[in-house]
Amino acid sequence: VGCEECPAHCKGKNAIPTCDDGVCNCNV
């Protein structure tokens, strides 16, 4: 999942979307 799709990807998981080196991470 790219950075631009990250917020939508993490939505509903009580997670904070972060992006490192172009990689989406959902930090719970």
Swiss-Prot record:
One of its GO terms (molecular function) is toxin activity. This is Potassium channel toxin alpha-KTx 9.7. Belongs to the short scorpion toxin superfamily. Potassium channel inhibitor family. Alpha-KTx 09 subfamily. SUPFAM superfamilies: Scorpion toxin-like (SSF57095). Has the structural arrangement of an alpha-helix connected to a beta-sheet by disulfide bonds (CSalpha/beta). The keyword Disulfide bond applies. Keywords: Calcium channel impairing toxin, Disulfide bond, Ion channel impairing toxin, Neurotoxin, Ryanodine-sensitive calcium-release channel impairing toxin, Secreted, Toxin. It holds the Pfam family Toxin_6. It comes from the Eukaryota.
